[in-house]
């Protein structure tokens, strides 16, 4: 809780000291799926949640505090979760769907870094079209925006798709 408050205080300080219109969290992901990483903290918390849900609730609490800190100054707050909603939830412990639904963020910008025709091992579930549709289908609180995060670094480099890559042209 102290670390969460420290980060939220930092968000507030940025908003108070600098003429910013928004605060954007990028690559804030949970550092590992290894249960040992925070096992002692989890045990000490006495939580009745599973360790995975406890991790998600910690991230949710951080996001809520930071959103409140930014909004105190009229500053927008948002984040760029990984592009795959399921991976975001299960491997990054970030319940971005909840943030959209509850208005924990003013906007979400999923990292949709795959091409329109992305196919890997016969699976097109990570194509831009599939993932953009999955995010767009999630319920959003009034006023919460959804933006597509694009990976400009892919231009000329491709995305490893079995179907070729429109990033080359």
Where do the model's predicted regions map?
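Polysaccharide-binding and catalytic clefts of secreted carbohydrate-active enzymes
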Residues: 1-102, 113-114
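Extracytoplasmic/secreted cell-surface and envelope-processing proteins
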Residues: 32-35, 87-89, 116-127, 156-165
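Well-ordered, non-membrane alpha-helical segments in soluble/globular domains
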Residues: 58-64, 92-93, 124-134, 165-169
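Loop/turn-rich, solvent-exposed surfaces of beta-rich toroidal or solenoidal domains
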Residues: 106-119, 123, 148
């Amino acid at each position: 809780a102290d670390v969460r408050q420290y980060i939220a205080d930092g968000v507030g300080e940025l908003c108070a000291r600098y003429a910013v219109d928004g605060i954007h969290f990028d690559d804030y992901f949970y550092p590992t799926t290894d249960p040992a990483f925070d096992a002692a903290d989890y045990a000490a918390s006495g939580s009745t949640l599973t360790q995975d849900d406890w991790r998600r609730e910690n991230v949710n609490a951080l996001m809520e505090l930071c959103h409140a800190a930014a909004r105190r100054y009229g500053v927008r707050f948002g984040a760029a979760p990984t592009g795959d909603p399921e991976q975001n939830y299960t491997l990054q412990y970030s319940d971005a769907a909840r943030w959209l639904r509850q208005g924990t963020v003013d906007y979400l910008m999923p990292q949709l870094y795959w091409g329109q025709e992305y196919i890997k091992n016969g699976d097109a579930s990570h194509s831009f079209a599939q993932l953009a549709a999955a995010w767009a289908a999630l319920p959003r609180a009034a006023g919460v925006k959804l933006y597509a995060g694009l990976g400009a670094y892919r231009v000329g480099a491709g995305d490893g798709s079995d179907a070729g890559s429109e990033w080359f042209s």
